[in-house]
Design a protein with these regions (language model features):
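Bacterial N-terminal signal peptides that target proteins for export
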Residues: 1-13
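N-terminal signal peptide c-region/cleavage motif recognized by signal peptidases
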Residues: 22-24
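Electrostatic cytochrome c docking/interface patches
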Residues: 26-51, 72, 131-160, 249-250
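The feature marks the first
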Residues: 29, 34-94
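Stable alpha-helical elements in mature extracytoplasmic
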Residues: 38-41, 53-56, 80, 87, ...
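The canonical Cys-X-X-Cys-His
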Residues: 42, 54-63, 120, 164-174, ...
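Sequence context surrounding c-type heme c attachment/ligation sites in exported
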Residues: 43, 47-58, 85, 157-168, ...
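Axial heme c-ligation environment in periplasmic c-type cytochrome domains
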Residues: 69-77, 91-127, 132-140, 178-184, ...
Length: 250
């Protein structure tokens, strides 16, 4: 078994990752808060597409950007402008090659100009509507393996000694994000969380700075992945008695 990634190692990884920000996204930190992005154009592309080259993003990701479990399409709404921008750039450049329904994304991303990717990323980060959470019971009834929420909570909050660090040490409380490096993963779609954690573990996805997510997911079992996804898919964004959500995901 690999050695546990203790706090000093995690901090070293974070420091190194901060220097590796993608040229397509995090190198544009002068655009943080998205000055220069045309949010109205991003909305148009999201809702209507771009001619015959790019269908409306909402077709798969939903009108509110909350994703669709049935298609394995992730939530994009409010998960972080720099992160979405980086993913679109990586998809366009061939640095991220999804499988399944997401396999069409590199073609669509490449059909967008860099400016249009900025526009779309900015628009989806303005989507702050009521959560449209995964229906875990419906997924279970349909034959999808669902984990144990309390076991997922333990991994997210505390990690497992000798296996994985706490998810919230990077992604913030209940996965509510820590911009600009770490996206919102709380209230993400269940099927997408399972697919991505599996891809990180199997190293079929490899566009993470310094291989951080691959290191974190390496020792996770299928049960661990299902448990984490079960908790995160319905995780509260606020602490008990506090309804204020910090601006952690711009």
């Amino acid at each position: 078994m690999r050695a546990f990634l203790g706090r000093p190692v995690v901090h070293l990884l974070l420091a190194g990752a901060a220097a590796l920000l993608s040229h397509n996204a995090l190198a544009h930190l002068e655009d943080y808060g998205y000055p220069g992005a045309d949010v109205a154009n991003g909305k148009k592309i999201f809702n209507e597409g771009k001619g015959d080259a790019v269908p409306a993003c909402m077709t798969c990701h939903g009108a509110g950007g909350w994703g669709l479990d049935a298609m394995g399409a992730p939530r994009l709404a409010g998960i972080g402008y720099p992160y979405v921008l980086k993913q679109l750039g990586d998809l366009a450049d061939g640095k991220r090659v999804p499988v399944g329904a997401g396999a069409v994304m590199p073609v669509f991303a490449a059909a967008l100009t860099e400016q249009e990717r900025h526009d779309v990323a900015a628009y989806v980060n303005t989507l702050k509507g009521p959560p449209e959470l995964s229906n875990l019971q419906e997924l279970k009834d349909g034959g999808t393996a669902i984990g144990e929420r309390y076991e997922g909570l333990a991994i997210v909050k505390y990690g497992v000694i000798g296996k994985v660090s706490a998810c919230q040490s990077c992604h913030g409380y209940n996965g509510r994000g820590a911009a600009p490096m770490f996206p919102v993963i709380g209230q993400q779609k269940y099927t997408y969380l399972v697919a991505q954690l599996t891809a990180w573990r199997d190293e079929s996805r490899a566009n993470d700075p310094y291989g951080m997510m691959r290191k974190m997911a390496h020792n996770l079992t299928d049960a661990d992945i299902n448990n984490v996804a079960t908790f995160l898919a319905s995780a509260s964004t606020t602490t008990a008695g506090n309804t204020v959500v910090p601006e952690t995901n711009q």
